[in-house]
From Swiss-Prot:
This is Carbonic anhydrase 6. Keywords: Disulfide bond, Glycoprotein, Lyase, Metal-binding, Secreted, Signal, Zinc. The gene is Ca6. One of its GO terms (biological process) is detection of chemical stimulus involved in sensory perception of bitter taste. GO terms for molecular function: carbonate dehydratase activity; zinc ion binding. The lineage of its organism: Eukaryota, Metazoa, Chordata, Craniata, Vertebrata. It comes from the Eukaryota. Residues 1-17 form the signal peptide. It is found in: Secreted. Its EC number is 4.2.1.1. It catalyses: hydrogencarbonate + H(+) = CO2 + H2O. The active site is at residue 84. Glycans are attached at residue 255. Its cofactor is Zn(2+).
Length: 317
């Protein structure tokens, strides 16, 4: 029995002691060297990116995403500290259907946050240069390939639903209370715990219909460029106390607190970011243009028609 315990201890020690990549370089290959070991990380379609709203193309043909079985209540999920973040497994009965009808089966979701040196913002995607407080990635694989392992290296193999977070000083989000309370059970890499009575839809923002979308990659090695990203416009709110707890609860492979676990934004490289909604500035510009055109129609047509009649009349003579 003691021998078995020793083997198990060595196994978990190995998990904690080794990681082949990291964000800072303190434990494994740092972000600036990822491309040396993982060539795709230096590719032309990398994620995350800064979404510049003035350059976003409105595509009215993009339908709202269909999140099937996300609303199922009181399910159980396995939550794991993988040494980089907290990951929660999702069942294959949940899937995302995109605007063109492609079905992507759910795999898992995980978080990215800040916290180091009092840095509260830790999202990966930024909007007009602004980094949000946190970001969650709901990872899905294309049903066409059967399994995640088959899909992860294939064209159009993956789809990720990105959820941004904002902070409210005191407004606790009770839908996240169980997840945050369970963090103490997975302090070290390799540890798992079970979430009970959880409804995934409650973890998303109220509005899941409006989104930005673009072709990109995984944001961690191997940075495979086969991901269609869907970044929701609406955000989830957490209290400051909840965010601070998340930032200071779990350890990495070097027994350091996991903080600032996000990748820097990558060059857009002429990719088109689309949205299925008009932003406020676009709506204002469109409305202003509409009013100007209406004003022209009201003031000018009568004079023009009269002039044309007169010309026609005199031409007969």
């Amino acid at each position: 029995m003691r021998a078995l315990v020793s083997v198990v201890s060595l196994f978990f020690l190995g998990i904690q002691a080794h990681s082949d990549w990291s964000y800072s370089g303190d434990d494994g290959v740092g972000e600036s060297q990822w491309s040396e070991q993982y060539p795709s990380c230096g590719g032309e379609r990398q994620s995350p990116i800064d979404v510049k709203t003035e350059e976003v193309m409105f595509n009215p043909s993009l339908k709202p995403l269909s999140l099937v079985n996300y609303e199922k209540e009181n399910l159980e999920f396995t939550m794991t500290n993988n040494g980089h973040t907290v990951s929660i497994d999702l069942p294959p009965s949940m899937y995302l259907e995109t605007s063109d009808g492609t079905e992507f089966i759910s795999k898992a979701f995980h978080f990215h946050w800040g916290g180091r040196d009092w840095e509260l913002s830790g999202s990966e995607h930024t909007i007009d240069g602004i980094r949000s407080i946190m970001e969650a990635h709901f990872v899905h694989f294309n049903k066409e390939y059967g399994t995640y392992e088959n899909a992860k290296d294939q064209k159009n193999g993956l789809a990720v639903l990105a959820v941004l977070f904002k902070i409210d000083e005191y407004a606790e989000n009770t839908y996240y209370s169980d997840i945050i309370s369970a963090l103490k059970n997975i302090e070290k890499p390799g540890e798992t715990t079970t979430l009970k009575d959880t409804t995934i839809r409650n973890l998303l923002p109220k509005d899941v219909h409006h989104y930005y979308t673009y072709p990109g990659s995984l944001t961690t090695p191997p940075c495979t460029e086969n991901v269609q990203w869907f970044v929701l416009r609406d955000k989830v709110t957490l209290s400051k106390a909840q965010v601070v707890t998340i930032e200071n609860s779990v350890m990495d492979h070097n027994n350091n607190t996991i903080q600032n676990g996000y990748r820097s934004t990558q060059p857009n490289n002429h990719r088109v970011v689309e949205a299925n909604f008009l932003n406020v500035q676009d709506m204002y510009s469109s409305y202003h243009l509409y009013l100007k055109n209406m004003q022209k129609e009201i003031l000018q047509p009568k004079k023009q028609k009269k002039t044309k009649k007169n010309r026609h009349f005199w031409s007969r003579k």
